[in-house]
């Protein structure tokens, strides 16, 4: 009796809806874990080299003293977190950090400042930083708080590639985290960024006490932007003593992986970035996140004021996984603007 040969069919990425109601996003979260990861990896392979990871470096160019009350942030002036307020860094110090980042393989350099919104005199200094970093062949990104009329255009003219402004969480949970700036303020800034022709970097933070439904609500807000963000940072809350969210029950690591997978499925062409909280994850969870569709990490020993895995540890992990870093500063697949 002869046995029949076993045939395997190559996975086919499912058709991606053009709009995602919260209930549909929640249905993805509720899939059996293996089914969700398989679907996310299939979508990922349709759009990216699954072994490639982008390295981005984040530098705090102005630390502490922020007047906002974000419950997760050690840079808020009203919280006693041990962070000392500092003025904006000198240009040469920023450029030295950018050179080091490029030498270690980073292709994107992000500059963050703890402002509610930048004053024009400070924005001029950032514009100069952007021009000089851009001249090194690095992609440039900035996160400076809310932007007023005309400020996004100034950053665009200086050569800024990306502007980061996170939604943080779902609208329904937002008031549990922040009271000094409303959700519409964030939407307005993102509209100014997009209107100026700057690519959008926008994501959120999980593990702040929100429910799965509220995590689905955050993803729905992101993926229903038109177009959705080119970069989507997924942060795992880093609990800092002195902040209101210190002591919050941590999110289950597999729930974090699910969040990455759902972001990948709903925003297939975006760079999904593992951001804050990687140091607490360990290698196995990070590896699962890469399988789930994450393809960018913040690289370096520190993110603004919180710790990050050492650069050597990141290189060793990528080698273990047989992954390589993105080698060019331009990636057309990150263009999610409808043709």
Swiss-Prot record:
Instruction: State any GO BP term from the record.
Output: biotin biosynthetic process
| Cofactor needs | [4Fe-4S] cluster; [2Fe-2S] cluster
Q: Which residues form the Radical SAM core domain?
A: 51-278
- Note the superkingdom of the native organism: Bacteria
Q: In the record's cofactor note, how is the cofactor described as bound?
A: Binds 1 [4Fe-4S] cluster. The cluster is coordinated with 3 cysteines and an exchangeable S-adenosyl-L-methionine.
InterPro entries, per database record? Aldolase_TIM (IPR013785), BATS_dom (IPR010722), Biotin_synth/BioAB (IPR002684), Biotin_synthase (IPR024177), Elp3/MiaA/NifB-like_rSAM (IPR006638), rSAM (IPR007197)
The residues the record assigns to binding [4Fe-4S] cluster are 66, 70, 73
Q: List the disulfide bonds.
A: none
* Enzyme Commission numbers on file: 2.8.1.6
Similarity annotation: Belongs to the radical SAM superfamily. Biotin synthase family.
Q: Which HAMAP family does the protein's record reference?
A: BioB
- Name of this protein: Biotin synthase
Task: State the organism named in the record.
Answer: Janthinobacterium sp. (strain Marseille) (Minibacterium massiliensis)
């Amino acid at each position: 009796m002869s046995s029949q040969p076993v045939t395997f069919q190559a996975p086919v990425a499912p058709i991606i809806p053009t709009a995602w109601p919260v209930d549909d996003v929640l249905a993805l979260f509720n899939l059996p874990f293996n089914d969700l990861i398989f679907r996310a990896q299939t979508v990922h392979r349709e759009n990216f080299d699954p072994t490639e990871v982008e390295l981005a470096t984040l530098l705090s160019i102005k630390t502490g003293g922020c007047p906002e009350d974000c419950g997760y942030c050690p840079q808020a002036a009203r919280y006693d977190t041990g962070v000392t307020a500092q003025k904006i860094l000198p240009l040469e110090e920023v450029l030295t950090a950018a050179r080091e980042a490029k030498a270690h393989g980073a292709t994107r350099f992000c500059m963050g400042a703890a402002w509610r919104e930048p004053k024009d005199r400070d924005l001029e200094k950032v514009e100069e930083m952007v021009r000089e970093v851009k001249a090194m062949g690095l992609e440039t990104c900035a996160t400076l708080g809310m932007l007023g009329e005309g400020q996004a255009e100034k950053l665009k003219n200086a050569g800024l590639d990306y502007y980061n402004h996170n939604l943080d969480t779902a609208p329904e949970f937002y008031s549990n985290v922040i009271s000094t700036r409303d959700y519409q303020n964030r939407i307005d800034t993102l509209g100014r960024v997009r209107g100026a022709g700057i690519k959008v970097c926008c994501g959120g933070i999980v593990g702040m006490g929100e429910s799965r439904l509220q995590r689905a609500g955050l993803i729905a807000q992101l993926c229903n932007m038109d177009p959705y963000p080119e970069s989507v940072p997924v942060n795992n809350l880093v609990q800092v003593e002195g902040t209101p969210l210190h002591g919050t029950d941590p999110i289950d690591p597999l729930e974090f992986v699910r969040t990455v997978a759902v972001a990948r499925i709903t925003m297939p062409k975006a760079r999904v970035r593992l951001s804050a909280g990687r140091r607490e994850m360990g290698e196995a969870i990070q590896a699962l996140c890469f399988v789930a569709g994450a393809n960018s990490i913040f690289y370096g020993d520190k993110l603004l004021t919180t710790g990050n895995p050492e650069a050597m540890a990141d290189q060793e992990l990528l080698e273990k996984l047989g992954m390589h870093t993105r080698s060019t500063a331009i990636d057309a697949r990150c263009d999610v603007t409808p043709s």
